[in-house]
Amino acid sequence: MELNHLVTGKIALNQYVHRLEQKDVSFYVHYWGAMTNHYNTLLHKHSFYEICYVVRGEGYYLEGDRTYPLREQTIFLSKPEHLHQIKSETGLFLFYVAFELSEDQSSAEWIKVMEEVKQSPFITMQLKDGEPPGLLWKTLMLQAAQPVNAFDKEILSHLSHALILSLIQTFLPYAQRPKQKQPIHTSSALLTEVKLHIKDNLSQPLKLTDVASHFHISGRHLSRLFAAELGVSYSEFVQNEKINKAAELLKSTNLSIKEIAEEIGFSVHYFTRVFSAKIGSSPGLFRSLYKDSKMTAFQINKPFQKIEQAKPHE
């Protein structure tokens, strides 16, 4: 992939992205840089952090009495007040960013985190293909190299903040990193998708096997999800959602009983029977009671999750 054109992204970043603020933490970015042929620097220091990413090329990073080799996918950290120097005979393609924590706008926890970074023994880290810091930096530069409008400024800001956090995490001492990844509960995420699908398609049959196939799982697995996480069967959940939708339409619209039945994928006869069993009243009576201005409450035989007590008609 040709990356030289990404260098122009630094223009937009330096124009629009300097203060990065999120809950509990704020960073000030002094400058963004990109150079396709970076050779040698003088021995120098900064009053802030500077992190560089080697996109291409080879060279050396010198700090104190140590020399660190640089090659493609190396990121290296220059800490405040540390004398350092970059050398390359053939030229390095570098992305770099200079930033510091705005302590007066950040929590004590974040001040501690940055102190841990300052004390970190890590100076250079070799990234593997596909690791977040490298991908985020290339994505940010790609986005910044495009014509920028108001919407793009928000994208640049959020991408920049994500990149800074990813870089900081990379240089934290191992002792400060979680020793084990937290388990990812994929079942809850899947169930959320299924529930949204059901609620958005109540006029459809929503058979268990069809919905399971839509989400590339077995019907048995889908049944277990509903039983384990919601304590109801799949069919009961679908029926409850349909009746809940019908009750909302009866209270808030002038649709006929037939039209409401069609909205939830039922025949009029089946809708009337199921609604009466669930609510304790026929659809017609439910509507008339709800619209009766003298009626202050409507008691249902089987209280249902979202059915509210009826209020006086205004």
Swiss-Prot record:
Keyword Lipid biosynthesis: no
Disulfide bonds: none
Coiled coil: none
Alphabetical keyword list: DNA-binding, Transcription, Transcription regulation
Keyword set includes Isomerase: no
Domain of life where this protein originates: Bacteria
CDD domains assigned: cupin_RmlC-like (cd02208)
UniProt domain HTH araC/xylS-type: residue ranges: 192-289
Example GO molecular function: sequence-specific DNA binding
Pfam families: AraC_binding, HTH_18
DNA-binding region coordinates: 209-230, 257-279
Protein name, UniProt field: Uncharacterized HTH-type transcriptional regulator YfiF
The organism of origin for this protein: Bacillus subtilis (strain 168)
